[in-house]
């Protein structure tokens, strides 16, 4: 949720054409698919569903697979500069993990969906770490990531960037906070939701964007986003 929103807002403030995909929806199915900040309309979604249905032929798809392929179909036709994809459940076997990301982010590892992901943080962390890719950045947004996440990152060859080791955040007076890493820092307006967890998510979003290949995002876009 919020990490995707931070990445999307900052990239759009930098002038990038951005698509975002989250799940599940709260009120309307249109919510999970955003094209340049605007929810996909009904006609676009219907066209995407029809395209996926035709392409799958006799191959069965789950609800989330169908929705993910539809979002990717729309993104490909719009011609984006950045696609931000949120994993729906776990990571290793999630439909979104079909895509090879330039940067992956794991914010926190909580004990939920235990019937599917495992009984504790170590087991769940191993599932979430499945989104890591060799030689690509893996941003870890909590200080005490499970050892299973770190083991998988190292075994995969991913470049783990860890909160509390590689980047930091701290509150400041006057409604601001500081993000920093070795050799760089930003002083930014406090997020609307100013809890430490939200600052950690915002800090992770900054690291993810700075780790992307290509043109750097200007500092002012981080403040505007």
Where are these regions (language model features)?
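Acidic, Mg2+-coordinating active-site environments of NTP-dependent enzymes
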Residues: 81-86, 101-192, 200-223
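Short, well-ordered alpha-helices that flank and scaffold nucleotide-derived cofactor binding pockets
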Residues: 8-13, 73, 77, 151, ...
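Short alpha-helix boundary/capping motifs
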Residues: 1, 65, 142-144
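Hydrophobic positions on the alpha1 helix immediately C-terminal to the Walker A/P-loop
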Residues: 2-7
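A generic local secondary-structure boundary/capping motif
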Residues: 93-96, 128, 196
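ATP-dependent carboxylate-amine ligase catalytic core
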Residues: 13-99, 115-117, 123
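A short glycine/serine-rich beta->alpha loop
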Residues: 56-61, 190-196
